[in-house]
Every structure is written in C-alpha cells, then in structure tokens.
Amino acid sequence: MLPELRDLFVRDLEKLTLELEAYPDEASVWAVPDGVLNSGGTLALHLIGNLSQFVGADLGGVDFVRDRPAEFARRDVPRAELIAGVRDVSALVAGTLDRLDPAALDAPHPTQLPGFPEGMTTRFFLIHLYGHLNWHLGQVNYHRRLL
C-alpha cells in the first residue's frame, strides 16, 4: 500500500504544480472572487503545511513547525515559490513513505486529532490526507478556471 500511496501523492502534487503554472498571471493565483473563500495560492500553502506536518514531521521526523494561520493569511507569495514548495513537499512525502516501515501503517498515527477516531491508525490518516489533497486540488482547478 505504501508504494501506491506514494505514487498517488506524487502524481497529484505534480497536478497541483501544473495547476499553479496554468494560472494566467501572478495576481490570479491570489484572486478571491465573490463566493470563494480561498485562492489557489492559499490552498497551495495550506497543502504544503499540512503534508509537511503530518507526513514529513510526524512520520519522517523532519524538523518542521507548522504555522497554520499563516497558511491562510499570507498573500502574494510568488508563484515560483509556491511551485518550489509543492515540489519540496512532494519529495518529502515520497521520501518519507519510501522509508516508512509498512508495520507503521497499523500503528496509531503520532498525532491524534479532534474529530478523528481515537487510536486512528497511520493507514487511516494517510488515506484521509490523500483525500484532503484531492479535495483541495479540485478546488484549485475550479478556482483557476473560474477566473
């Protein structure tokens, strides 16, 4: 299951990179039209923080301190910086999953979060994180086409 999850995360983070590259200009990455809560740039920052924390730090032991409020507050980060961040987190996720002992999938995830089952396994949470990535990837795609 780990190789499949790794490949899916890498594939869809590459799709996120392609979406960011497809915006017509820098300003549109950060545009928030009426009825839309988050820009494509905000969603990219959020996914970078989310995966850096829950995969890179929690499972891979990478030194990372997440600033979730900043993920939603920062604006006008250059598109090249966003793309570099997505590529970095893709490599981080791939490397972490490559090194993860398959037995860890059935162990409780190191971070237990409110609203999730008590004793949530790493397998459960990785599947959740992949769904979360895809939810926001779809939002970025819609946001880009809406503009």
Predicted regions and their residues:
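Surface-exposed helix-capping loop/turn segments at secondary-structure junctions
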Residues: 22-29, 96-107, 145-147
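N-terminal first-folded block
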Residues: 13, 19-22
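Acidic/histidine-rich alpha-helical segments that form the ligand environment
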Residues: 74-110, 124-133
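Active-site rim elements
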Residues: 1-6, 79-80
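Short, contiguous alpha-helical
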Residues: 6-10, 14, 26-70, 111-147
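A structural signal for well-ordered alpha-helices, especially hydrophobic packing surfaces
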Residues: 20, 51, 90-97, 137
